[in-house]
Amino acid sequence: MSTVGAGIPEPPRDEPNSAWLNDTELEWVRGRMPLLYVEAVPVRVDGLGVVTQVGVLLRANAQGEITRTLVSGRVMYGETIRDALFRHLEKDLGPMAFPQLPASPVPFQVAEYFPIPGLSAYVDERQHAVSLAFVVPVTGTFEPRQDALELTWVTPAEASSPAFHAELEGGRGTLLRAALASVGVLG
């Protein structure tokens, strides 16, 4: 990879319009600016639209520990928020999850992750990131893919407990609590 101007990397020559960054490019960008992410709290709802179950993923983190987390991922250059949200829901939950994206995708919260603990409730050791967080009803069947090991369904009361929040990485317990409050089911 060569650089242009003041150390700005050129896009890979084999894919000049690629929206993906290789590991070197991603590390370079992460060290210089916040990245935009979407996060989703998958939920099941009853006939009146009341949340009856909350889905959380089980994953192995970079240290090899098994932790709970939410659907999450970067927004690619040129990608709409709606498309990024759908892509990450399908990537993590499988193609038959059938997420019900809202007509107007407005996040319940904007979360700002910092690599330094204490600057906000949200921590990501790799980077400074801004995440748009959504509650998304899903109606299909689930086959966790990529690095997700399992999707666990819990009641809103279970998802509201401090012990459950402690199992979520990077402050996502706080984000889950805000999600539950946004749909009126904080236990």
What are these regions (language model features)?
Residues M33-Y37, G49, E65, L70, ...:
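Short connector loops at helix/strand junctions that flank enzyme active sites
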Residues V41, V51, E90, P115-I116:
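A structural signal for the main folded, soluble domain(s) of proteins
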Residues A40, L85, F134-V136:
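A structural signal for short, well-ordered beta-strand segments
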Residues P42-R44, L58, V138:
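Residue-level signal for short segments within beta-strands and strand-turn junctions
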Residues Q63-R68, Q127, S131-G187:
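Nudix hydrolase/Nudix homology domain
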Residues S2-G47, V123-D124:
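Acidic, metal-coordinating catalytic segment for phosphate/diphosphate chemistry
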Residues G94-T141:
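Active-site segment of metal-dependent pyrophosphate-handling enzymes
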Residues G49-F98:
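Conserved Nudix-box catalytic region and its N-terminal flanking loop in Nudix hydrolases
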